[in-house]
Amino acid sequence: MRAMRVIMNSMSEISESPPVLDEMVQRITERFSPDKIILFGSRARGDARPDSDIDLLVLFSEVEDPRQRAVELYQSLLDFPRPMDIVVSTTYRFERYRNVVNTVYWPASREGKVLYERAA
């Protein structure tokens, strides 16, 4: 069994029902084994409207085709009745560009909430 750590301490601050996020995180981790899942955008900031989407940055140590992996993630979550935006990248790329303004990594690193992180 692989080691993992799920971070739940900030879930009360997130403007999405925790059971939905818990289920999404569980499904993603079981099927895809990412390094980290970060919620960012309005739901992480706490200013989401009822029609706001769920923005997830899903990081892997390696991923050959990020777009294809994003499609696979979307397909695995089709039964969730929420609009979502899933960005797939590598942990290396996130760490390298997290301080670069106008990248998706910038807001994810500044305001994001880590929902899952694989134990080292």
Please place each PLM-identified region on the residue numbering.
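Short, conserved active-site loops that position catalytic residues or coordinate cofactors/metal ions
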Residues: 52-54
